[in-house]
């Protein structure tokens, strides 16, 4: 019986590796890794002699910076998660004491170190991304208390900064071309809508904790319409730019991807709470596919500023 008591989860002093990995949420790493890759492709620069930068940059964007942001968010969201998702590592007790905070700090430091080793622009982008991650979750700023600010911070960090970093690193730390910057900005705006989709699963907990997510502020129907608009409008902007730049067939592909999303969005709007996950799972991939299509469209077409 004594051994049984000693080995109970409540007596654990250190988190299990599986709990740390769950805290870092590998499933969330894909968007910034993809955006970094899009930024790389948009330069049109050969990978020859630069593979180490590509690999290091992808690791920086996903398993480091994004993972750090997830740990930060879970630590400062532990009260909300105790209501919405009590099975998560911190509220469940599998991440004992202040270990959630320790992991967030350690991963932040390691991310800054890797960014510094890659290049000056990578370090600057890493610093900005991590500042947004901490300001998103940490009082007194806590951007996520307001859905407009919080979703914007995520969109900039996950898409815009990652895209910018990929372009800058591959171009030898030169400032990316104007078309690449414009695409990064537009897809960052679109990511604002994607982030809103994630808020439909936590409406009750957000209300109780005073988190002004867009579903709380605008109501379910209003937030759903806003999410669709924020996703679609930037993509139509991308379509227009590709036409101006003479990338006609890529513009046609963007239209087809938009059409597929619109079909799913019409279904989503009928019952946003139940169908947000479906749109995230099947509509968002069309959005991110458009990112790569547009990156290939501008690759090598334009010189740097």
Predicted regions and their residues:
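Multi-pass alpha-helical membrane architecture of UbiA-family
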Residues: 1-305
């Amino acid at each position: 019986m004594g051994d049984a008591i000693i080995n109970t989860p409540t007596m654990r002093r250190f988190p299990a590796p599986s709990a740390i990995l769950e805290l870092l949420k590998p499933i969330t790493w894909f968007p910034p890794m993809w955006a970094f890759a899009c930024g790389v492709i948009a330069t049109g620069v050969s990978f020859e002699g630069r593979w180490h930068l590509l690999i290091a940059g992808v690791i920086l964007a996903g398993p480091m910076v994004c993972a750090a942001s997830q740990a930060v968010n879970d630590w400062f969201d532990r009260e909300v998660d105790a209501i919405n998702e009590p099975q998560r590592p911190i509220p469940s007790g599998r991440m004992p004491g202040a270990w959630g905070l320790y992991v967030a700090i350690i991963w932040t430091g390691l991310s800054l170190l890797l960014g510094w080793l890659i290049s000056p622009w990578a370090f600057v982008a890493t610093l900005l991304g991590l500042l947004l991650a901490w300001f998103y979750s940490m009082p007194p700023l806590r951007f996520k208390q307001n859905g407009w600010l919080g979703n914007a911070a995520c969109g900039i960090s996950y898409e815009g900064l990652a895209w910018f970093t990929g372009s800058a690193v591959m171009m030898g730390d030169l400032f990316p071309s104007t078309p690449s910057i414009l695409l990064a900005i537009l897809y960052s705006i679109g990511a604002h809508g994607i982030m809103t989709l994630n808020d439909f699963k936590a409406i009750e907990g957000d209300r109780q904790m005073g988190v002004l997510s867009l579903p709380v502020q605008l109501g379910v129907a209003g937030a759903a319409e806003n999410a669709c608009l924020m996703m679609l409008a930037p993509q139509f902007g991308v379509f227009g730019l590709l036409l101006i730049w003479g990338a006609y067939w890529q513009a046609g592909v963007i239209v087809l991807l938009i059409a597929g999303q619109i079909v799913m969005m019409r279904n989503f709007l009928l019952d946003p709470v139940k169908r947000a996950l479906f749109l995230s799972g099947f509509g968002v991939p069309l959005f991110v596919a458009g990112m790569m299509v547009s990156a290939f469209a501008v690759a090598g077409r334009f010189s740097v500023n």
